[in-house]
Amino acid sequence: MRLAVFGGSFDPPHNGHLALCLYARELLQVDRLVISASNNPLKDAPQAADRDRVKMAELLAETINRTGAFAEVSSWEANRGHPVYTIDLMEYLEEIYSTSDLTLLIGEDNFLNFRQWKSWEELIRRYSIIVFGRKADDGASDDSAISERLHDQSFRHIDLNLPLSSTEIRKRLASGDDCSAEIPSPIWQYIVENQLYQ
């Protein structure tokens, strides 16, 4: 089994996350996608509660699976109640799914501090890594710039040209803006019904 792993805060999930997952299904030739709502040790604590972020990740998976089962959510990280490192998640999933054929999907914002990650060299050695960019006019979106930053060629870079940011969406939601165009409909409905990010 070829497994893709997409971890993130998902605070909240947006259409950029959805596009990344759909790209993985259609073009990366992986059998299954595991979405993991994480507590990133290198970022501020998420604004939404873990249970809400896991639920929104589940709604993201349901949206992806409307055209066939592909994505599922792991709550292993969120249930541990403290930050978990990516290498720990990958090793856990290797054991659970009995496969070492894992591909790590990360956003370019997280990639920029990749060398601060625990065991980042081991991640490169053991797993395929695909970095997804948000927009083409960002200087960091150039393949050569990313290669220079990491000094390694064992990854791919794919630019989705979707300049969406959960941080910016949270700010807009706190100001009372309507962000329904940037967020998958079931997730938007959940945010409104549960009065998140107000």
From Swiss-Prot:
Pfam families per the UniProt record, alphabetical: CTP_transf_like
Q: Does the keyword ATP-binding apply?
A: yes
User: What superkingdom heads the lineage?
Assistant: Bacteria
Q: Which top EC class applies here?
A: transferase
| Involved pathway(s) | Cofactor biosynthesis; NAD(+) biosynthesis; deamido-NAD(+) from nicotinate D-ribonucleotide: step 1/1
Gene Ontology molecular function, alphabetical:
ATP binding; nicotinate-nucleotide adenylyltransferase activity
Q: Which reaction does it catalyse?
A: nicotinate beta-D-ribonucleotide + ATP + H(+) = deamido-NAD(+) + diphosphate
Q: Tell me the keywords, alphabetical order.
A: ATP-binding, NAD, Nucleotide-binding, Nucleotidyltransferase, Pyridine nucleotide biosynthesis, Transferase
- Its EC number is 2.7.7.18
Q: Which CDD domains match?
A: NMNAT
Keyword ATP-binding found:
yes
Which GO terms are recorded in the biological process aspect for this UniProt protein? Answer: NAD biosynthetic process
HAMAP family (UniProt xref): NaMN_adenylyltr
Q: Which NCBIfam families match?
A: cyt_tran_rel, nicotinate (nicotinamide) nucleotide adenylyltransferase
Say which family it is in. Answer: Belongs to the NadD family.
Functionally, this protein is described as follows: Catalyzes the reversible adenylation of nicotinate mononucleotide (NaMN) to nicotinic acid adenine dinucleotide (NaAD).
Identification of the protein by name:
Probable nicotinate-nucleotide adenylyltransferase
The species this protein was found in: Chlorobium phaeobacteroides (strain BS1)
Q: Which gene encodes it?
A: nadD
